[in-house]
């Protein structure tokens, strides 16, 4: 009997906590209007996930803790569409893809995307549909090591869009290895020979997500970097020179690929190039991509990069500092809001700490990072793991889609909405 009473007491305590959580999320802050929107059926966490997302974006102190007790978004819809090949109209509508240019300005300025993926199928779909518009073009590099079921599902989606294709040449991508750089080069070759015209190319990985809309990305490029490449970076610091002075060869122990150092020292860079260190992420003009694929300096630099550690952190920025390269920025530094990343080494200076968890030096975002993310001037953010914290991407995705549709200058198709009614209690224009 005493055990039964204890169980009942525990249930009562949980019920009281749930009521408090619900009232907390429903209670507006003083700056918010007391007028409430039309209300659908109440569930255990309010109008899930909108109200919880609103509380997270507004930085309400208890919201990240509350998020742990609420149900996670259900991804079965995405998997059901892709593991059951069928009518492409059903797939594009069911997965809420935008199927027309949203303004004349966007229709006249096409972007190319390179997306390298190897896991998290639902996250890939969320990323692609966030950046997808029919006037852009997308090259997907699927890691050769990815499971066949994963590859088949990606192919099912890609088959439904004329402007999305999978790279014909794939790599077994190694962390910090040359294959990461080669995967981008493979896609660039496909993009320049495709029938689609594009102005700039942007590279992404499967753990990135946009925090700016397509229109905002175009405005940023045109206003700040017209006909210029964005490759944030500086002359290689002394403390990381071992990455390029010592040889790092890829090898495969028990199925994983690594690029550890060996005892052989590298030859000097070709053409007496000054080596820079910077971001692996870029925004490049089409002419610069054509230069990368044809110029002897670029070809020799690519060959030299085959046995250095993390060559993608050196290759793009080094070549973009050449004065004769198309769109070059020889005097640039770290400027260029390409990616919002929280590094552990920068905690306290650049950001207020990771609210999720650090993997190596990089923050995998948690719900508590959302206020920082939406205030960032960057175009994209990294790093997300929906398998760990699915609500982070879900909140960003819903907010992003509302912003996209608010900026549209064409009639909105019903299937572009994620739900019939939105219950975000926040200002999207801040």
Curated annotation (Swiss-Prot):
Enzyme class (EC, first level): transferase
Cytoplasmic side: 1-8
Sugar attachment sites: 87, 272
Pathway: Protein modification; protein glycosylation
Keyword Transmembrane annotated: yes
Main localisation: Golgi
The EC number(s) this enzyme carries: 2.4.1.-
Annotated TM spans: 9-25
Pfam families registered for this protein in UniProt: Branch
Protein topology in the membrane: Single-pass type II membrane protein
GO CC terms of this entry: Golgi membrane
The protein, known as: Probable beta-1,3-galactosyl-O-glycosyl-glycoprotein beta-1,6-N-acetylglucosaminyltransferase 7
Natural source organism: Homo sapiens (Human)
Gene giving rise to this polypeptide: GCNT7
């Amino acid at each position: 009997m005493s055990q039964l009473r204890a169980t009942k007491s525990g249930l009562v305590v949980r019920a009281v906590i749930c009521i408090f959580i619900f009232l907390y999320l429903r209670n507006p802050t003083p700056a918010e209007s007391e007028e409430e929107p039309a209300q659908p059926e109440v569930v255990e966490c309010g109008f899930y996930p909108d109200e919880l997302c609103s509380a997270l974006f507004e930085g309400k102190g208890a919201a990240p803790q509350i998020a742990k007790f609420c149900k996670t978004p259900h991804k079965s819809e995405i998997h059901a569409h892709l593991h059951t090949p069928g009518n492409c109209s059903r797939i594009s509508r069911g997965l809420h893809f935008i199927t027309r240019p949203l303004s004349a300005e966007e229709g006249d300025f096409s972007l190319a995307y390179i997306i390298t993926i190897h896991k998290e199928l639902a996250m890939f779909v969320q990323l692609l549909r966030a950046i997808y518009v029919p006037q852009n073009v997308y090259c997907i590099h699927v890691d050769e090591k990815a499971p066949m079921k994963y590859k088949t599902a990606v192919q099912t989606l890609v088959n439904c869009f004329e402007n999305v294709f999978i790279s014909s040449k794939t790599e077994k991508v190694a962390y910090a290895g040359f294959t990461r750089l080669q995967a981008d080069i493979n896609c660039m070759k496909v993009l320049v020979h495709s029938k689609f015209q594009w102005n700039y190319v942007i590279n992404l990985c499967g753990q990135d997500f946009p925090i700016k809309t397509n229109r905002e990305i175009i405005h940023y490029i045109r206003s700040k970097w017209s006909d210029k490449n964005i490759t944030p970076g500086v002359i290689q610091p002394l403390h990381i020179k071992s990455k390029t002075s010592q040889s790092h060869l890829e090898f495969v122990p028990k199925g994983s690929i690594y690029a550890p150092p060996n005892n052989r020292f590298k030859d000097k860079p070709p053409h007496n190039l000054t080596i820079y260190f910077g971001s692996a992420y870029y925004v490049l003009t089409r002419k610069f991509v054509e230069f990368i694929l044809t110029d002897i300096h670029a070809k020799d630099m690519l060959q030299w990069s085959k046995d250095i550690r993390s060559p993608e952190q050196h290759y793009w920025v080094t070549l973009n500092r050449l004065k004769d390269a198309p769109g070059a920025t020889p005097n640039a530094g770290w400027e260029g809001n390409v990616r919002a990343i929280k590094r552990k080494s920068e905690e306290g200076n650049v950001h207020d700490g990771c609210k999720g968890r650090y993997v190596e030096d990089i923050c995998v975002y948690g719900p508590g990072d959302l206020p920082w993310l939406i205030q960032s001037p960057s175009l994209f953010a990294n790093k997300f793991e929906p398998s760990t914290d699915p609500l982070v991407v879900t909140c960003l995705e819903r907010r992003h889609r509302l912003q996209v549709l608010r900026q549209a200058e064409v009639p909105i198709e019903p299937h572009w909405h994620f739900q019939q009614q939105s219950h975000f209690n926040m200002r999207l224009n801040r």
